[in-house]
Swiss-Prot record:
The gene is st7. This is Suppressor of tumorigenicity 7 protein homolog. The chain crosses the membrane at residues 19-39, 448-468, 475-495. It is found in: Membrane. Belongs to the ST7 family. It is a multi-pass membrane protein. Its main location: membrane. It holds the Pfam family ST7. InterPro entries: ST7 (IPR007311). One of its GO terms (cellular component) is membrane. Keywords: Membrane, Transmembrane, Transmembrane helix.
Amino acid sequence: MFGTESSLSMFLNTLTPKFYVALTGTSSLISGLILIFEWWYFRKYGTSFIEQVSVSHLRPLLGGVDNSTASSSSSSSNGDADSSRQSVSECKVWRNPLNLFRGAEYNRYTWVTGREPLTYYDMNLSAQDHQTFFTCDSDHLRPADAIMQKAWRERNPQARITAAHEALDLEDCATAYILLAEEEATTIVEAEKLFKQALKVGETCYRRSQQLQHHGSQYEAQHRRDTNVLVYIKRRLAMCSRKLGRTREAVKMMRDLMKEFPLLSMFNIHENLLESLLELQNYADVQAVLAKYDDISLPKSATICYTAALLKARAVSDKFSPEAASRRGLSTAEMNAVEAIHRAVEFNPHVPKYLLEMKSLILPPEHILKRGDSEAIAYTFFHLQHWKRVEGALNLLHCTWEGTFRMIPYPLEKGHLFYPYPVCTETADRELLPTVFHEVSVYPKKELPFFILFTAGLCSFTAMLALLTHQFPELMGVFAKAFLSTLFAPLNFIMEKVESILPSSLWHQLTRI
């Protein structure tokens, strides 16, 4: 034993300062490489490589598999498939039902600020929508429709407008009027006039194709296209009335449209109706619309969830006081309002910061991602005034919305009332929103993994040691010897105690082994 100690002491005494410099430099280099790799992996995949390997591979080898996981593996396969299908549907990009007019609103913003409110990805999705709604395979039979079919594919706005005028020079064309109303009209009044002209042409085409739809697949496709055109025109006319202050007229137009075409849910006209009814403060009709569309079998939206929360909050918000509630507890009505807020926040956690004006708003995009930042912006842009109008509603939201996150500590893995929060929202929102002047809201906030912080600290510490050893080799050699002596002191103490307890003959036999 004493021979081993003397050998170790002799080895330490023969080490030169260059050895410590090389040792610390090598350690610093290795730590730096690990840090760079960890940071790259985290930025690309959102998780720590070392942590993932530890959980996925080392934990099963060490016997860390939960029994519940093993016992439910067969039953969870179907659940995983269902959740994956749900994830795909929730990551689908939807057309914003309240989208603004390009010429009368988006372009005016660009003229004033010099900023582009729409991204190329968003406008490209709109071009695809227009080709789906406003074209069909038989467009080549009519010269005006053939021109418009090319116009919807054109990327240059001025070229699209020129093509629309060329189509109108040949004959009246509903889709040409639509394009001019959307992109050339600089005011809502001008857009409304063009949409009214489009309505006359669109109704004529719709009645004609309705009579011929059963004569073949070609006529059926024409009728489907004409139906989409007519619904789009009427919906935009209703939105023009809403923007020009004729809200009751807009509500009537929307109700008539929903009765005439009840199966065309792709336009989500009920969300336009909800916003207009809130403007009229007709809360009874708002509740009736919610009763029809806030169903477990129907897809949810921020408009549905937060409007339901607003109605529940309206019943108690004017008298709500957090101090009084903490003393006496929440009443049944207050509990219902808080639960409705928690439900809405779980569906889209980005909305409260915009409603509470903790984050600045921008113009909403033409497409939104449900449960994402884009949907939160679109909802708040039109509904903030309705929350402000209800006395105490924002105060109740401010006091209760953060409590939602206690119920869902791991939102990406398990939800409370909804499916887990989809991980694809951040990527899609960065494509939909102008990140040049808007910081995309991310949920949940990504924190740096422990291993990245650890390797960063280790890299910094070893680099500092290498620098000090290079500058003060003799002093650092003394510190290194003192550190090693201190490190081995407990071991030496234990060995001395063992030697004093065990008989010398037994210890002699053990050392010989």
